[in-house]
Swiss-Prot record:
PANTHER family: SCAVENGER RECEPTOR CLASS B TYPE-1 SR-B1 (PTHR11923), SENSORY NEURON MEMBRANE PROTEIN 1 (PTHR11923:SF69)
Cystines in this chain: C267-C332, C296-C352, C334-C341
InterPro entries named in the record: CD36_fam
Extracellular topological domain: 32-457
Organism in which the protein naturally occurs: Culex quinquefasciatus
Sequence ranges of Basic and acidic residues compositional bias: 514-528
Ranges annotated as spanning the membrane: 11-31, 458-478
Signal sequence interval, chain numbering: none
Source taxonomy: Eukaryota, Metazoa, Ecdysozoa, Arthropoda, Hexapoda
Protein name: Sensory neuron membrane protein 1
Length: 554
């Protein structure tokens, strides 16, 4: 086929239309169809697959605990700088389950109790065993004294007397215990004394949920034992059937619509989900909000950049605790703002746990440099200690996540106390825990078709742009080249002239005088050929001779 026979104008129109159709399909129609399908499936509708996974997470989460072993307790008692060693991880499986579920179709809500169950994994903990002996701050002693000194100082003598009776002899703020006793099995506490101070102290510890009964005369204290396999509270959340943006959002906790731990309304709100689910269709500007009853606060992860997980493109989110002194909106978390705010990179957990405890990232990563200077033995590493989520914005799927939180004691001297009067004023790390999960191929393959559609959609879009643009421009150029005839303009030949000067003649007319000077006309020799009609025969061809009488006037 000859190019002259091709209708390049039609080809250009077809290419332009193909580009428009391709862009419309890839940027509007196909994405909307996918979103419609996701809206139908990403709802906590009774009997749905998502609902079953939400009620009981079908795999165990990784729960790892690291404990800071105090190597110089006696020096600390005299005001010295602590030296610590990170011992761990001690590995547990964490199973999350929701039960006693009630649905309300009118409100589009579900109400349930939630429990966490931890199972020790010695195979993954090895070479550690959980039987290691470690030295840590004894929260039942120094934690109680610090809390009473801060909030109810008038009761300090009574509490001190009760502690002297229960822990006789009371000689240190630290205790050496077996790891598993500290974490789950429990440290025995003798509450058999009939002394009023001792009975009042044991009764107070029991009512606060700090200890569990061991027998008629003893109770036991541990970090996680009381919460293992028991309800952490009753939640009411949105199911997301009517509005998918509300999926999993916490409405009430233990029938309360807000907390009462803080002075400001903003800090007492439940913001976000219970961290086991997140809504879909988020953007990079949105935060991943989750509220936790263990810390009585909402934490929001922020977008930090693009990432990938097992070949899937994801968005990387992290959490920065920041500095409340520079955040007036959330200074309601401070005891006495702005000077009473916790150090940069920490959050005050005292109102929630009833003890002077600060939360932070492990090894004070991202915190005030003074926190690191006050303790020997800390080695912050972003890969090991930062909080992260590899997240898919469209489906709300966390492919891989690690929530890491360190618990620290706000240490200070106990005023007027012989044993604890020389303690340094500083933030002492006690332990840190990591709760995390990473989807294996069993779960990621279920999302693969969706990502294949995304790749296909992106391919259609860019092919439409590239081929449509090149085809339109190329066809338009060929149409112009073949069908738009150029106009040939003949160059005009310019008349060439030669000018000669004629010497004037002198005449006396018989008077002996020269006549007045006359201006003689120039004789122009014209050499012209092929002149246009305007010149050829127009002016030059029709020039009449000048009469002699008129020449005299020159």
């Amino acid at each position: 086929m000859k190019l002259e026979n091709v209708n390049f104008r039609k080809v250009a129109i077809i290419c332009a239309c193909t580009m428009v159709v391709g862009l419309t399909v890839s940027m509007a129609i196909l994405p909307e169809l996918v979103n419609l399908m996701l809206r139908q499936n990403l709802r906590l509708k009774p009997g749905s697959d998502l609902r079953k996974m939400y009620e009981k997470v079908p795999f165990g989460l990784d729960f790892k605990v690291h404990i800071f072993n105090i190597t110089n307790p006696q020096e600390i008692m005299q005001g010295g700088r602590p030296r610590v060693k990170d011992i761990g991880p001690f590995y547990f499986e964490e199973w999350k389950e929701k039960y006693d579920i009630e649905d309300n179709d009118g409100e589009d809500t579900m109400t349930f109790d939630m429990k966490n169950t931890w199972i020790f994994r010695p195979d993954l903990t090895a070479p550690l065993t959980g039987n290691e002996m470690i030295t840590v701050p004894y929260l039942l002693v120094i934690g109680v004294l610090l809390a009473i000194q801060r909030d109810k100082e008038a009761m300090l003598p009574l509490i001190s007397k009760g502690l002297d009776i229960i822990f006789e002899p009371l000689e240190s703020a630290f205790v050496t215990v077996r790891v598993m006793d500290l974490l789950f099995d429990g440290i025995p506490v003798d509450c058999s004394s009939e002394e009023f101070a001792a009975k009042a102290l044991c009764s107070g510890l029991d009512s606060e949920g700090a200890v569990a009964p061991l027998n008629d005369t003893h109770v036991k204290f541990s970090m996680f034992g009381l919460r293992n396999g028991t309800s952490i509270g009753r939640f009411k959340v949105y199911r997301g059937i009517k509005n998918v943006a509300d999926l999993g959002r916490v409405i009430t906790y233990n029938d309360e619509t807000e907390m009462d731990f803080y002075d400001g309304d903003e800090c007492n709100k439940y913001v976000g989900t219970d961290s086991t689910i997140f809504p879909p269709f988020l953007t990079k500007k949105d935060r991943l909000w989750a509220w936790s009853p263990e810390i009585c606060q909402s934490l929001g992860a922020v977008y930090a950049g693009k990432s990938s997980y097992q070949g899937f493109p994801t968005s990387f989110f992290t959490i920065d605790f920041g500095d409340l002194r520079d955040d007036p909106v959330h200074q309601c978390y401070c005891r006495d703002p702005p000077d009473g705010c916790p150090p940069k990179g920490t959050i005050d957990l005292g109102p929630c746990v009833g003890a002077p405890i600060l939360g932070s990232k492990p090894h004070f990563i991202g915190g005030d440099p003074k926190l690191l200077r006050d303790v020997d033995g800390l080695e912050p590493d972003p890969k090991e200690h930062d909080i992260f989520i590899h997240y898919d914005l469209q489906t709300g799927t966390p492919f891989s996540a690690a929530k890491r939180l360190q618990f620290n004691l706000e240490l200070e001297p106990i005023r007027g106390h012989e044993v604890f009067g020389k303690l340094p004023k500083m933030v002492l790390p006690m332990f840190w825990a990591e709760e995390g999960a990473s989807l294996n191929k069993t779960w990621t393959k279920q999302l693969k078709p969706l990502f294949m559609i995304r790749k296909f959609n992106a391919t259609v879009k860019w092919l439409s742009i590239v081929l449509g643009t090149l085809g339109t421009i190329g066809a338009g150029f060929m149409h112009y080249k073949l069908h738009i005839k150029p106009v040939n303009v003949r160059p005009m030949e310019v008349q060439k002239t030669t000018v000669k000067e004629v010497e004037p003649s002198v005449e006396t007319n018989g008077t002996g005088k020269e006549p007045p000077e006359k201006i003689e006309p120039r004789v122009v020799e014209s050499a012209h050929r092929n002149l246009p009609p305007l010149f050829d025969g127009g002016l030059a061809g029709k020039q009449k001779p000048v009469p002699s009488d008129q020449r005299e006037r020159f």
